[in-house]
Curated annotation (Swiss-Prot):
Residues 79-120 have a biased composition (Acidic residues). This is Putative KilA-N domain-containing protein L32. GO terms for molecular function: DNA binding. PROSITE patterns: KILA_N.
Length: 372
């Protein structure tokens, strides 16, 4: 007959086996939970403290439900506590790694922000620099290559050296004309030049004295003269040199080719060109003389159009500033009408004039002078 083990011993053996099975099961569960916790923490975990608290709650629940036998349960709880501590230690390490990773990410983002700020600052400074360059390219002061003093400098205008007022970019037109073999007074007294300055004053809102400034006196003679607005200087350059006038035409053509809008704008402005006021005045005088003397106006010849042709006279009408032009034209027409008296009619004669000298010159060519 087989020997039966005491009941208490069997119970104790079964309990130990059950306890071992449960212990192994719990160990597997803890291993799974531990690996899952690490995986979640490394990938997207934003709150390590939460994971830690859940793990602690789990370990506490296991301790409470499984402590039936005093000795075994004490042994079990000690083992479980050690495992919990290991789990907490691992989670703390993961937390530390995660916090370090977050810190590195923050530092990286901070560096990126600083880089963006630096790039933004660089872009702003670049824009400002480009604006400065652009403004200098549109300013006559950009041609300066040597300073005379704090207010005046020397620049290059075509093939000529010019004196520039550094405060406003105005150029000494008197000296420029002199260097080119011209007299600034001739340009300034020209009726078309006066009309030009008048229109420019209306366009810019600047008075004549602000468009044309005079420097009188001083030890340096070259600094004396009339300093003119850059737009006026272009007109003077056109008057001085036909080559310069051609260059202006080339620049305009290049500007037109740059954009179709520029071409349309050019022809639009061209269609709004007003007749030179002297042309109107010349026409009025022409009609008045025709009414008084009779004859025909604008008579066509191989040399041009005669202003007024009467039975005994050839009359050429011009402003005082253009009397030399009138002289050349009347001599040409005189070859075609040798039996008629040659006459020049001048208008807009200034108070300070050289009418007496002009009469002497005209008399040498058999030309009479009419004027009002």
């Amino acid at each position: 007959m087989p020997h039966k083990a005491p009941k208490s011993k069997l119970f104790r053996t079964r309990y130990v086996e059950d306890s071992d099975d449960e212990t192994r099961g719990r160990s597997r569960n803890r291993s799974v939970e531990k690996s899952r916790s690490k995986s979640l923490t490394r990938s997207k975990s934003k709150s390590p403290k939460k994971s830690r608290s859940k793990s602690l709650d789990r370990s506490k629940n296991v301790k409470t439900t499984k402590s039936k036998n005093t000795n075994k349960s004490n042994k079990y709880t000690e083992e479980d506590s050690e495992d919990s501590e290991d789990s907490e230690s691992d989670q703390d390490d993961d937390k530390s790694d995660n916090e370090q990773s977050d810190s590195e990410l923050d530092d990286s983002e901070s560096d990126d922000d600083e880089t963006d700020d630096n790039e933004s600052d660089n872009d702003k400074s670049k824009d400002n620099f480009e604006n400065i360059i652009e403004s200098k390219e549109n300013d006559f002061r950009n041609i300066i290559f040597e300073n005379i003093n704090e207010k005046f400098a020397i620049g290059k205008f075509g093939d000529f050296e010019v004196i520039i007022n550094r405060d406003n970019g105005y150029i000494n037109a008197t000296q420029l004309c002199k260097d080119c073999g011209k007299d600034y007074k001739n340009w300034n007294q020209n009726e078309k030049s006066r009309e030009f300055v008048k229109k420019l004053s209306q366009y810019t809102g600047l008075s004549n004295t602000n468009l044309l400034t005079k420097i009188i006196g001083g030890n340096n003679v070259k600094l004396r003269g009339t300093y003119v607005h850059p737009i006026i200087l272009t007109n003077i350059g056109n008057w001085i040199s036909p080559t310069f006038a051609i260059k202006i035409g080339e620049w305009i053509e290049e500007w037109k080719k740059f954009s179709r809008k520029n071409t349309l704008k050019y022809y639009k402005e061209l269609s709004k060109i007003e007749l030179y006021s002297n042309n109107d005045k010349e026409k009025q005088i022409q009609l008045a003389l025709q009414k008084s003397l009779g004859g025909k106006i604008e008579v066509r010849t191989k040399h041009g159009y005669v202003d007024l042709l009467t039975k005994d006279k050839i009359i050429e009408i011009k402003s005082y500033d253009n009397w030399k032009h009138a002289l050349g034209q009347i001599l040409a027409y005189g070859e075609l009408y040798e039996n008629k008296n040659k006459c020049i009619y001048l208008f807009d004669i200034p108070s300070k004039n050289e009418i007496a000298n002009i009469k002497i010159i005209l008399k040498k060519f058999g030309i009479s002078l009419l004027c009002i």
